[in-house]
């Protein structure tokens, strides 16, 4: 199988509700779809969401990155897979989401060439998963209503977005905790909104109310590594690093410092599947469990995340792959059953993707 062409398309889809964090507000999904074609007619599909506030990438920069890499891949054999992956990452630094979209498409092709679903090619066997759902930041009453709506849909784990106002954040969490049955698990995500000192004070305030979330995600700035360690040494609530980890070296530093309890893996940060798998292995060597998350992105890249979760099910113990459920509609059909909190993989080859010129669909 020889690569003959690489195309890019934009995917736009409305959200059910605005997605609001301490970093940004999003009203509609806009993703880049990457289509890699081979001489035997096999096609691979990848996807990535520009998230300039986190990865520094825009739609324009992602398209430019793919266009820059494209001529170096045309004519290459998929059988030279490892060399192709190494080449992609040697050609340009950073630009992690664009490279992830390319990687996903190439992994899709490789699995199709072996007539296997991607998760089985990667050594995975698990097919059934549960994800949380994100509750966007808003007024307390609205967030409580959104929590009840999510629970009614079958979610038993909610990720609460906070981080814009420290005192209000505590009030939000206390009110939400009090409004829900105690079997509902809460995850907190401040998206870098607090200082280290504030984090300790606010988490202590919650812990005095016997509110210990499943974790607090990235409470401080991405580069505040010492701040993460300061927090971990002073609170009961487990600490999960997100924006602080883009690379293996980022993770190794935090793990060696014993600065975190969990690692959040996102393909858009790890520049694709290859380093995501390596990151899971590294975390396992330190005895630290992982969560696999996603940006606000479409079914192709979310599906890739589920395949990775299956491949590393022994260390990826939590899923935050709710982006498909946040969409009001999208132009894709999927053999992967995204049924709110429940996700079920199929035995379709590769990611299981079928594409027409106008519509990317997952078959």
Regions found by a protein language model. Give the residues of each.
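Conserved, mostly hydrophobic/aromatic
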Residues: 3, 34, 41, 69, ...
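Active-site mouth loops of central-metabolism enzymes
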Residues: 128-142, 162-163, 190-196, 240
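Catalytic core of soluble alpha/beta enzymes
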Residues: 160, 167-301, 329-331, 336-338
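Glycine-rich phosphate/pyrophosphate-binding beta-alpha loops
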Residues: 48-56, 134-138, 291-294
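Flexible C-terminal active-site loop/helix
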Residues: 4-15, 29, 295-363
């Amino acid at each position: 199988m020889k690569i003959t062409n690489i195309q890019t398309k934009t995917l736009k889809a409305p959200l059910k509700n605005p997605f609001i964090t301490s970093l940004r507000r999003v009203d509609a999904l806009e993703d880049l779809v990457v289509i890699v074609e081979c001489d035997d007619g096999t096609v691979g599909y990848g996807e990535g969401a520009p998230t300039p506030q986190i990865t520094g990438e825009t739609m324009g920069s992602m398209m430019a990155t793919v266009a820059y890499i494209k001529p170096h891949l045309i004519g290459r054999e998929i059988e030279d897979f490892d060399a192709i992956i190494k080449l992609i990452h040697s050609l340009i630094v950073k630009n992690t989401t664009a490279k992830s979209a390319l990687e996903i498409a190439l992994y899709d092709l490789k699995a199709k060439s072996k007539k296997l679903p991607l998760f089985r090619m990667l050594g995975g066997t698990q097919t059934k998963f549960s994800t949380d759902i994100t509750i966007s930041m808003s007024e307390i009453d609205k967030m409580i209503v959104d929590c009840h709506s999510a629970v009614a849909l079958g979610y038993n784990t909610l990720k609460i977005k906070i981080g814009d106002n420290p005192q209000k954040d505590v009030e939000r969490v206390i009110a939400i905790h009090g409004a829900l049955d105690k079997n509902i698990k809460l995850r907190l995500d401040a998206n870098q909104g607090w200082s280290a000192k504030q984090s300790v004070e606010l988490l202590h305030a919650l812990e005095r109310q016997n509110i210990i979330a499943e974790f607090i995600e990235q409470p401080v700035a991405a580069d505040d590594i010492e701040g993460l360690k300061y927090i971990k040494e002073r609170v009961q609530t487990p600490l999960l690093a997100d924006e602080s980890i883009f690379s293996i070296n980022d993770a190794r530093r935090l793990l060696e410092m014993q600065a975190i309890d969990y690692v959040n893996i996102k393909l858009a940060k790890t520049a694709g599947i290859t380093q995501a798998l390596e990151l899971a292995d590294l975390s396992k060597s330190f005895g630290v469990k992982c969560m696999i998350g996603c940006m606000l992105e479409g079914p192709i890249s979310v599906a890739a995340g589920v395949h990775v979760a299956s491949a590393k099910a022994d260390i990826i113990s939590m899923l935050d792959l709710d982006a498909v459920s946040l969409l009001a509609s999208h132009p894709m059909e999927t053999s992967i059953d995204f049924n709110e909190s429940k996700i079920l993989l199929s035995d379709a080859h590769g990611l299981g993707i079928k594409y027409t010129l106008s519509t990317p669909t997952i078959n």
